[in-house]
A protein has these predicted regions:
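Activation targets extended, charge/polar-rich intrinsically disordered C-terminal tails
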Residues: 7-14, 134-244
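N-terminal low-complexity, Pro/Thr/Ser-rich intrinsically disordered segments
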Residues: 2-24
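Glycine-rich catalytic cores of cysteine/serine-nucleophile enzymes that process amide/ester linkages
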Residues: 21-121
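Short linear sequence motifs
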Residues: 52, 70, 87-93, 111-115, ...
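Low-complexity, intrinsically disordered/propeptide-like segments
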Residues: 4, 31-33, 229
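Acidic low-complexity segments
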Residues: 100-157
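Solvent-exposed, acidic/flexible segments
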Residues: 38, 42-45, 90-94, 122-132, ...
């Protein structure tokens, strides 16, 4: 298998009257992974992570249900396994983007539908990047370190992962807004849970006490928002997938 990457860098020009050039050297990327798999092995929700490049270092913040998945009951419905919206909240902090994207590309590789990751990058200053890093460091302070590998560390956070939030998308946007406050300002216009949630989940949520949020919480909806980018101009776009 080979990995195909497509890239489109959007250049911006400085004002002709600008005397001193202060160029942002750091980068923030929102990584949006598609659903993958089919049938009982389908993972329907997609994934979102934050990738920071600053001072020659890489930080990928990857929050998900990577621990124990917990069954969730909604009236007459009980969702468990891959369809459950709840699980232990695990934060994986990667130090290598190539290692992260290699693992993402493997998701669903043996099924009829593998993962595609869409990356939307923004040039930011080091001080902005550090605001994002500090956001995650504060989460880590009260967490339990559960694994340390060559390319990432795993932390069990005090909060569960839940489909309506906190989840990979809501946490990624909360972190991103530390550096780019206007991110997802008009995100509510792109919320469309019917497009993403499987039928069982839709019925379960309708029978529950939960109301669908009016903020972005599903990766696929976030991807629609970032494609249009009504609030913040995207500087760098990349797509990652396995080439069959």
């Amino acid at each position: 298998m080979t990995t195909t990457t497509t890239s489109n860098t959007i250049k911006s020009s400085n004002s002709p009257t600008q005397q001193v050039s202060l160029k942002p050297e750091a980068e923030l990327h929102l990584l949006v992974g598609s659903a993958y798999g089919t049938g009982e092995k389908e993972s329907p929700y997609g994934h979102t992570a934050v990738y920071i490049k600053v001072q020659g270092k890489e930080y990928i913040y990857d929050f998900g249900r990577y621990g124990r998945i917990k069954p969730e009951t909604f009236g007459p419905f009980t969702l468990s396994g891959a369809s459950s919206p709840r699980g232990e909240g695990i934060l994986k902090v990667w130090s290598s983007f190539s290692a992260y994207i290699e693992e993402e590309n493997r998701q669903g590789a043996n099924s009829g539908r593998s993962r595609t990751t869409y990356a939307y990058g923004y040039k930011i200053f080091d001080s902005q990047a550090n605001l994002v890093i500090n956001y995650y460091n504060n989460l880590i302070k009260s967490s339990l370190s559960v694994q340390n590998t060559t390319h990432y560390k795993r932390y069990k956070l005090n909060q569960d992962y839940f489909a309506l939030g906190p989840n990979c998308t809501t946490q990624s946007l909360d972190a991103t807004k530390k550096a780019i406050p206007s991110m997802a300002k008009s995100g509510h216009r792109f919320v469309n849970s019917d497009k993403v949630l499987p039928t069982t989940a839709k019925l379960a949520f309708k029978a529950s006490k939960y109301e669908m949020p009016n903020y972005l919480f599903l990766p696929d909806n976030l991807n629609d928002y970032l494609k249009e980018s009504p609030d913040v101009k995207v500087n760098i776009k990349n797509t990652y997938r396995i080439n069959r």
